[in-house]
Amino acid sequence: MALRFPRFSQGLAQDPTTRRIWFGIATAHDFESHDDITEERLYQNIFASHFGQLAIIFLWTSGNLFHVAWQGNFETWVQDPLHVRPIAHAIWDPHFGQPAVEAFTRGGALGPVNIAYSGVYQWWYTIGLRTNEDLYIGALFLLFLSAVSLLGGWLHLQPKWKPSVSWFKNAESRLNHHLSGLFGVSSLAWTGHLVHVAIPGSRGESVRWNNFLDVLPHPQGLGPLFTGQWNLYAQNPDSSSHLFGTSQGAGTAILTLLGGFHPQTQSLWLTDMAHHHLAIAFLFLIAGHMYRTNFGIGHSIKDLLEAHIPPGGRLGRGHKGLYDTINNSLHFQLGLALASLGVITSLVAQHMYSLPAYAFIAQDFTTQAALYTHHQYIAGFIMTGAFAHGAIFFIRDYNPEQNEDNVLARMLDHKEAIISHLSWASLFLGFHTLGLYVHNDVMLAFGTPEKQILIEPIFAQWIQSAHGKTSYGFDVLLSSTNSPAFNAGRSIWLPGWLNAINENSNSLFLTIGPGDFLVHHAIALGLHTTTLILVKGALDARGSKLMPDKKDFGYSFPCDGPGRGGTCDISAWDAFYLAVFWMLNTIGWVTFYWHWKHITLWQGNVSQFNESSTYLMGWLRDYLWLNSSQLINGYNPFGMNSLSVWAWMFLFGHLVWATGFMFLISWRGYWQELIETLAWAHERTPLANLIRWRDKPVALSIVQARLVGLAHFSVGYIFTYAAFLIASTSGKFG
């Protein structure tokens, strides 16, 4: 008999029902569970798939460059970045007739186009690209890298080129390679690009392959580097009247510490960023030489961990046993990587708007809103994934004998204290925050707004003042003209910082009040509850008082039958599933807050946010309802406008989201009966009954239906908010 899907599990391939298909898809990437898997093949498969991932990323970015060069208006946009709308690509087949064609023909295009809200135009402009030819060359180069990556993936699956398990487990070499080779060298290379191409480009000088060996990035060349007079590279920076992309007001400095923003572009100084990347390169190049490999010098990570026994015996045997535990568990390593990447992605969201790195991006409000929201949602999914793999580690890879009385074992030993403290924090935050909001709602409803409970966030205001914000009148540290830090800051480091933090036209340290205090605590509630669910899922993954043998049931199980009542919904997977809803909920509050505060800032009526954000009705009426009106008007009796595509996506997002509940609220029995009835009807319908199936149709398992429901809920939720965000922002600011 021919091999049926899935080839990696012969047991599943012989399943006579449609379960074969869904379980096959669900376990396709769970390499550990496949037939005939060895540790060696497991590592090699994952290694090869990384190359495939890189190939897809390079192909995707190549496509961005190619479509903008082919169908965009990059060269026109470069002439006037503030008033020309950047085009992402053409719309091939605009439906709905002539009104649609007219509505979507913009940005100086000849036909219907999509506007880019990704910030790529600002990014490419900042790093020195100026023409469509530049974009095409970039696209071809990335296409080449994509092909090389695919070749690399194929090569490392060939017997001669397969790395051994010992190579994969050589932690010191990998750390050195990634720290020095990946971060260090690439940061140094990026500094080189900024100094040799981007900074001259910002001063109106085009440096390309044909002249980059002739153009000195700095008048004195490498002289100051070799004579130790490095400060010469910081002298004569661009002036505050510098026009970006021209020589007017330009200086000659290449590595500076100016601080603040370029007055015209409202983005960080390119020379500051070059300096930053050089410093990062220096640090990482050193860090990549710290671990012992073939040369017998440097640290052994195992020795470091073994030696690290905290004083007083309070953490038992400290980090003994951790090296082998982590180095032999791919799930532990993936959990650590995802936790780090999740935090970094969220930090990217926070810093992209407050410290914009790309020229003119701060004035493109829709792009700012889209990038913030995008990075926060990505961060949420990555962070929940970190806990999922942490839980799988405890179920599949954790060895109690190997970790006796070390920090990992002690986490499990006092998990009740950890979980109950998190529970207490969540309850406290939830009841108090909701109590304040509801009290204020009632006061507004009764016509006595002066009886609201409004709490000034004085500690946060004090922290902002310490960083130099003067409007609160705290007169402390950098906001005090008498402090040594203030005086040093004027000359030695970041003289532009204090101007930037007290300037009202950027998003640096926004002024905060009672509305911010409340929403901050609502977000804290969401973060703590999400963390509670995830931490409990991981710490109880091996077993709990209710179900001591839980680890024998694996990561995801629906229940342990009727004989052990109450074992439903307690698998580690169920914790992940619940946590994703809370994660989405929390990021909803975060993005609502960010967006509403910024809309009022950009429109110059911050009082609307300040007055309406202290009670729930204010959020519902003055943020959600007020800003969705343009969206709902995408189609109206007078035809359609350029927001109509977002109006459609808003409706479609709600549809997908609502479909999620069909899977989340009805379970297997209902679907099984429905499927059997439909199959009966099919088999008795002429013509239709000519179509037969080999697999007996059965309903999804409870766990699978939950996954499908969760996927629809998440995708619909994000689609709906994306349409709302882009339409309400672009509708106001063009």
Swiss-Prot record:
Membrane topology summary: Multi-pass membrane protein
Known catalytic reactions: reduced [plastocyanin] + hnu + oxidized [2Fe-2S]-[ferredoxin] = oxidized [plastocyanin] + reduced [2Fe-2S]-[ferredoxin]
Binding positions ([4Fe-4S] cluster): C559, C568
PROSITE patterns for this protein: PHOTOSYSTEM_I_PSAAB
Family per similarity comment: Belongs to the PsaA/PsaB family.
Role this protein plays: PsaA and PsaB bind P700, the primary electron donor of photosystem I (PSI), as well as the electron acceptors A0, A1 and FX. PSI is a plastocyanin-ferredoxin oxidoreductase, converting photonic excitation into a charge separation, which transfers an electron from the donor P700 chlorophyll pair to the spectroscopically characterized acceptors A0, A1, FX, FA and FB in turn. Oxidized P700 is reduced on the lumenal side of the thylakoid membrane by plastocyanin.
Annotated InterPro entries: PSI_PsaA/B, PSI_PsaA/B_CS, PSI_PsaA/B_sf, PSI_PsaB
Gene this chain is encoded by: psaB
Name of this protein: Photosystem I P700 chlorophyll a apoprotein A2
Pfam families for the chain: PsaA_PsaB
Keyword Transcription: no
Compartments where located: Plastid, Chloroplast thylakoid membrane
Entry GO CC: chloroplast thylakoid membrane; photosystem I
Subunit field text: The PsaA/B heterodimer binds the P700 chlorophyll special pair and subsequent electron acceptors. PSI consists of a core antenna complex that captures photons, and an electron transfer chain that converts photonic excitation into a charge separation. The eukaryotic PSI reaction center is composed of at least 11 subunits.
Gene Ontology BP annotations: photosynthesis
Annotated cofactor note: P700 is a chlorophyll a/chlorophyll a' dimer, A0 is one or more chlorophyll a, A1 is one or both phylloquinones and FX is a shared 4Fe-4S iron-sulfur center.
